[in-house]
Curated annotation (Swiss-Prot):
<dbReference type="InterPro" id="IPR005659">
    <property type="entry name" value="Chemorcpt_Glu_NH3ase_CheD"/>
</dbReference>
<keyword id="KW-0145">Chemotaxis</keyword>
<comment type="similarity">
    <text>Belongs to the CheD family.</text>
</comment>
<dbReference type="GO" id="GO:0050568">
    <property type="term" value="F:protein-glutamine glutaminase activity"/>
</dbReference>
<dbReference type="InterPro" id="IPR038592">
    <property type="entry name" value="CheD-like_sf"/>
</dbReference>
<protein>
    <recommendedName>
        <fullName>Probable chemoreceptor glutamine deamidase CheD</fullName>
        <ecNumber>3.5.1.44</ecNumber>
    </recommendedName>
</protein>
<comment type="function">
    <text>Probably deamidates glutamine residues to glutamate on methyl-accepting chemotaxis receptors (MCPs), playing an important role in chemotaxis.</text>
</comment>
<dbReference type="InterPro" id="IPR011324">
    <property type="entry name" value="Cytotoxic_necrot_fac-like_cat"/>
</dbReference>
<dbReference type="Pfam" id="PF03975">
    <property type="entry name" value="CheD"/>
</dbReference>
<dbReference type="GO" id="GO:0006935">
    <property type="term" value="P:chemotaxis"/>
</dbReference>
<keyword id="KW-0378">Hydrolase</keyword>
Length: 203
């Protein structure tokens, strides 16, 4: 029996010498929330990240996910397995922010990723599908998007400073190894092989 897929709290914490502050690095399928003055870092290919914060308190967080490959006919079906996983990935982050003291009416988002990086996916480009999902989700949930850098053909390194809302994005036009591609392909295979964990609460 397949194990359910769950979003994981990132545990890779380190001191970033460039920004002279604590940092949390998140990988595919992970998220991180904080009320501290730290930077959250990730590298995106076809995956997307939502950087969401309470603009008043500075409580914020980031996730890193992609939609499982599903039936192309289900692309806009909100209860398809693919959309259910995306909804789950977003709600895990938002619910954790609310638990930490963020107020829903103060939430704002910046969204990144969805590059045309992974090959071998059918129908719509997986990066475009991920980008379209996160835009629609935030629109449906009335969370204002105040910045975005989506699609294109390049991976991105994203630095998010929740306390201030600042985001720095570096497009990686030259890759020195295939670590990013390997991570995303492995994540995509896990998603395809496993069911989504838990029930999704739509609110």
């Amino acid at each position: 029996m397949a194990n359910p897929i769950e979003e994981q709290l990132a545990t890779n914490l380190y001191f970033d010498k460039t920004f002279n502050c604590e940092a949390a690095k998140i990988l595919p399928g992970e998220y991180y929330t904080t009320n501290q003055d730290i930077v959250i870092v990730t590298v995106l290919g076809s995956c997307v990240s939502a950087c969401i914060r309470d603009k008043v308190s500075g409580i914020g967080g980031m996730n890193h996910f992609m939609l499982p490959e599903g039936n192309p006919a289900d692309a806009n079906n909100p209860v398809s397995e693919s959309a259910r996983y995306g909804t789950y990935a977003m709600e895990v982050l938002i619910n954790q922010l609310l638990k930490n003291g963020a107020r829903r009416e103060n939430l704002e988002a910046k969204i990144f990723g969805g590059g045309n990086v992974l090959s071998g996916f059918t129908a719509i480009n997986i990066g475009e599908k991920n980008a379209a999902f996160v835009r629609k989700y935030l629109r449906d949930e009335n969370i204002r998007v105040v910045g975005e850098d989506l699609n294109d053909i390049y991976p991105r390194k994203v630095y998010f400073f929740p306390r201030t809302g600042r985001v720095l994005v570096k497009k990686l036009k030259q890759m020195h190894n295939n670590t990013l591609i390997s991570r995303e392909e492995s994540y995509a295979k896990r998603l395809k092989a496993n069911k989504v964990a838990g029930e999704v609460e739509l609110f």
